[in-house]
Protein backbone atom coordinates (compact mmCIF):
# COMPACT_ATOMS: atom_id res chain seq x y z
CA UNK A 1 0.00 0.00 0.00
CA UNK A 2 1.20 3.46 -0.77
CA UNK A 3 1.74 6.20 1.76
CA UNK A 4 3.24 9.04 -0.20
CA UNK A 5 2.87 12.78 -0.58
CA UNK A 6 2.68 14.79 -3.75
CA UNK A 7 5.10 17.67 -4.47
CA UNK A 8 3.63 21.15 -4.64
CA UNK A 9 5.08 21.64 -8.11
CA UNK A 10 4.91 19.23 -11.02
CA UNK A 11 8.07 17.18 -11.11
CA UNK A 12 9.19 14.29 -13.25
CA UNK A 13 9.20 10.90 -11.56
CA UNK A 14 12.60 9.79 -10.35
CA UNK A 15 14.37 7.84 -13.06
CA UNK A 16 16.75 5.24 -11.72
CA UNK A 17 18.81 5.60 -14.86
CA UNK A 18 19.51 9.22 -13.87
CA UNK A 19 20.78 8.37 -10.40
CA UNK A 20 24.39 9.31 -9.85
CA UNK A 21 26.55 6.34 -8.88
CA UNK A 22 28.26 6.47 -5.51
CA UNK A 23 31.92 5.58 -5.72
CA UNK A 24 33.59 3.07 -3.44
CA UNK A 25 35.54 5.83 -1.70
CA UNK A 26 32.34 7.72 -0.91
CA UNK A 27 30.68 4.55 0.36
CA UNK A 28 33.68 3.86 2.57
CA UNK A 29 33.59 7.39 3.97
CA UNK A 30 29.86 7.11 4.69
CA UNK A 31 30.47 3.83 6.49
CA UNK A 32 33.27 5.40 8.56
CA UNK A 33 31.03 8.34 9.43
CA UNK A 34 28.21 5.89 10.26
CA UNK A 35 25.81 7.83 8.04
CA UNK A 36 22.89 6.52 6.00
CA UNK A 37 20.86 8.51 3.46
CA UNK A 38 17.20 7.77 2.79
CA UNK A 39 16.50 9.98 -0.20
CA UNK A 40 13.61 9.46 -2.63
CA UNK A 41 10.63 7.15 -2.58
CA UNK A 42 10.39 4.38 0.00
CA UNK A 43 10.56 1.08 -1.89
CA UNK A 44 11.32 -2.55 -1.11
CA UNK A 45 14.74 -2.12 -2.74
CA UNK A 46 15.55 0.93 -0.62
CA UNK A 47 14.38 -0.87 2.53
CA UNK A 48 16.67 -3.80 1.79
CA UNK A 49 19.61 -1.46 1.23
CA UNK A 50 19.00 0.63 4.35
CA UNK A 51 18.34 -2.36 6.62
CA UNK A 52 21.52 -4.03 5.34
CA UNK A 53 23.49 -0.87 6.10
CA UNK A 54 21.98 -0.63 9.59
CA UNK A 55 22.89 -4.22 10.45
CA UNK A 56 26.40 -3.81 9.02
CA UNK A 57 27.02 -0.64 11.04
CA UNK A 58 25.63 -2.30 14.17
CA UNK A 59 27.98 -5.25 13.66
CA UNK A 60 30.96 -2.93 13.23
CA UNK A 61 30.42 -0.83 16.36
CA UNK A 62 27.95 0.29 19.01
CA UNK A 63 28.66 3.93 18.15
CA UNK A 64 25.78 6.19 17.16
CA UNK A 65 24.35 6.12 13.64
CA UNK A 66 23.01 9.13 11.73
CA UNK A 67 20.18 8.66 9.25
CA UNK A 68 19.30 11.53 6.90
CA UNK A 69 15.77 11.48 5.48
CA UNK A 70 14.43 13.39 2.48
CA UNK A 71 11.48 11.44 1.09
CA UNK A 72 7.99 11.85 -0.38
CA UNK A 73 7.00 8.54 1.18
CA UNK A 74 6.06 5.37 -0.64
CA UNK A 75 5.46 1.74 0.28
CA UNK A 76 4.18 1.49 3.86
CA UNK A 77 5.50 -1.98 4.62
CA UNK A 78 8.95 -0.97 3.39
CA UNK A 79 8.78 2.02 5.72
CA UNK A 80 7.74 -0.34 8.51
CA UNK A 81 10.78 -2.51 7.83
CA UNK A 82 13.20 0.41 8.20
CA UNK A 83 11.27 1.79 11.21
CA UNK A 84 11.47 -1.54 13.03
CA UNK A 85 15.10 -2.22 12.11
CA UNK A 86 16.18 1.16 13.51
CA UNK A 87 14.57 0.16 16.80
CA UNK A 88 15.94 -3.38 16.61
CA UNK A 89 19.66 -2.66 16.38
CA UNK A 90 21.77 -1.84 19.45
CA UNK A 91 23.41 1.48 18.42
CA UNK A 92 21.51 4.69 19.03
CA UNK A 93 20.18 6.20 15.82
CA UNK A 94 19.78 9.94 15.25
CA UNK A 95 17.50 10.96 12.39
CA UNK A 96 17.96 14.25 10.55
CA UNK A 97 15.12 15.47 8.34
CA UNK A 98 15.98 17.58 5.31
CA UNK A 99 14.01 18.76 2.30
CA UNK A 100 10.71 17.09 2.99
CA UNK A 101 9.79 14.19 5.22
CA UNK A 102 6.43 12.91 4.07
CA UNK A 103 4.13 9.99 4.68
CA UNK A 104 6.15 6.76 4.94
CA UNK A 105 9.22 8.98 5.31
CA UNK A 106 7.64 10.46 8.44
CA UNK A 107 6.96 6.92 9.68
CA UNK A 108 10.69 6.22 9.49
CA UNK A 109 11.45 9.59 11.07
CA UNK A 110 9.52 8.77 14.27
CA UNK A 111 11.30 5.45 14.81
CA UNK A 112 13.56 7.12 17.40
CA UNK A 113 12.76 9.13 20.57
CA UNK A 114 12.01 12.83 20.08
CA UNK A 115 15.37 13.92 21.51
CA UNK A 116 17.03 12.06 18.62
CA UNK A 117 14.79 13.53 15.93
CA UNK A 118 16.38 16.58 14.32
CA UNK A 119 15.79 18.55 11.15
CA UNK A 120 17.27 21.37 9.11
CA UNK A 121 15.45 24.74 9.16
CA UNK A 122 13.69 24.47 5.79
CA UNK A 123 12.44 20.92 6.18
CA UNK A 124 8.73 20.34 5.64
CA UNK A 125 6.72 17.46 7.02
CA UNK A 126 3.57 15.79 5.70
CA UNK A 127 1.25 13.48 7.60
CA UNK A 128 -1.80 11.91 6.00
CA UNK A 129 -3.81 8.74 5.66
CA UNK A 130 -2.46 5.77 3.68
CA UNK A 131 -3.99 5.10 0.30
CA UNK A 132 -4.30 2.02 -1.84
CA UNK A 133 -5.86 0.90 -5.06
CA UNK A 134 -7.08 -2.49 -6.14
CA UNK A 135 -8.98 -4.06 -8.98
CA UNK A 136 -10.93 -7.25 -9.11
CA UNK A 137 -13.85 -8.77 -7.32
CA UNK A 138 -15.87 -6.80 -4.80
CA UNK A 139 -14.67 -9.11 -2.02
CA UNK A 140 -11.03 -8.28 -2.81
CA UNK A 141 -11.78 -4.55 -2.79
CA UNK A 142 -13.54 -4.95 0.56
CA UNK A 143 -10.53 -6.76 2.04
CA UNK A 144 -8.21 -4.03 0.78
CA UNK A 145 -10.42 -1.33 2.30
CA UNK A 146 -10.39 -3.09 5.68
CA UNK A 147 -6.60 -3.37 5.58
CA UNK A 148 -6.23 0.35 4.82
CA UNK A 149 -8.47 1.20 7.78
CA UNK A 150 -6.42 -1.04 10.09
CA UNK A 151 -3.19 0.45 8.77
CA UNK A 152 -4.49 3.97 9.34
CA UNK A 153 -5.41 3.11 12.93
CA UNK A 154 -1.95 1.65 13.52
CA UNK A 155 -0.24 4.73 12.09
CA UNK A 156 -2.38 7.01 14.24
CA UNK A 157 -1.19 5.15 17.35
CA UNK A 158 2.45 5.40 16.23
CA UNK A 159 2.31 9.15 15.60
CA UNK A 160 0.31 9.76 18.78
CA UNK A 161 2.96 8.00 20.85
CA UNK A 162 5.78 9.77 19.01
CA UNK A 163 4.38 13.30 19.29
CA UNK A 164 2.38 13.24 22.52
CA UNK A 165 -0.74 14.33 20.63
CA UNK A 166 -3.97 12.44 21.31
CA UNK A 167 -5.08 9.79 18.85
CA UNK A 168 -8.23 11.83 18.25
CA UNK A 169 -6.19 14.89 17.23
CA UNK A 170 -3.90 12.87 14.98
CA UNK A 171 -6.91 11.26 13.30
CA UNK A 172 -8.50 14.66 12.71
CA UNK A 173 -5.30 16.27 11.45
CA UNK A 174 -4.48 13.54 8.93
CA UNK A 175 -8.01 13.39 7.55
CA UNK A 176 -6.49 15.57 4.82
CA UNK A 177 -2.87 16.32 3.94
CA UNK A 178 -1.34 17.87 7.06
CA UNK A 179 1.73 19.98 6.27
CA UNK A 180 4.09 21.30 8.92
CA UNK A 181 7.10 23.59 8.74
CA UNK A 182 10.13 22.78 10.86
CA UNK A 183 8.91 25.12 13.61
CA UNK A 184 5.37 23.74 13.38
CA UNK A 185 6.69 20.19 13.60
CA UNK A 186 8.73 21.07 16.68
CA UNK A 187 5.67 22.58 18.38
CA UNK A 188 3.65 19.51 17.37
CA UNK A 189 6.12 17.16 19.05
CA UNK A 190 7.35 15.63 15.82
CA UNK A 191 10.79 17.28 15.90
CA UNK A 192 13.06 17.42 18.91
CA UNK A 193 15.53 20.03 17.67
CA UNK A 194 16.07 22.22 14.62
CA UNK A 195 19.74 22.41 13.63
CA UNK A 196 21.59 24.62 11.15
CA UNK A 197 25.06 23.11 11.15
CA UNK A 198 26.76 19.76 11.59
CA UNK A 199 28.39 20.99 14.78
CA UNK A 200 24.97 21.01 16.46
CA UNK A 201 24.45 17.28 15.96
Curated annotation (Swiss-Prot):
Localization terms from the record: Cytoplasm
InterPro entries: ClpP, ClpP/crotonase-like_dom_sf, ClpP/TepA, ClpP_His_AS
PROSITE patterns from the UniProt entry: CLP_PROTEASE_HIS
Alphabetical UniProt keywords: Cytoplasm, Hydrolase, Protease, Serine protease
EC category: hydrolase
Function: Cleaves peptides in various proteins in a process that requires ATP hydrolysis. Has a chymotrypsin-like activity. Plays a major role in the degradation of misfolded proteins.
Protein name in UniProt: ATP-dependent Clp protease proteolytic subunit 3
Gene name linked to the record: clpP3
Amino acid sequence: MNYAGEPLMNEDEDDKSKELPIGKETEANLFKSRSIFIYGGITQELAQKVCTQLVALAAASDDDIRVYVNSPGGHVESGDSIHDMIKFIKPKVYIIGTGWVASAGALIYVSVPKERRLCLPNTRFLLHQPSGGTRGMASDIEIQAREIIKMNQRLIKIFSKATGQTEEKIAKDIDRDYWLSADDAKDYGLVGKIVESQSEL
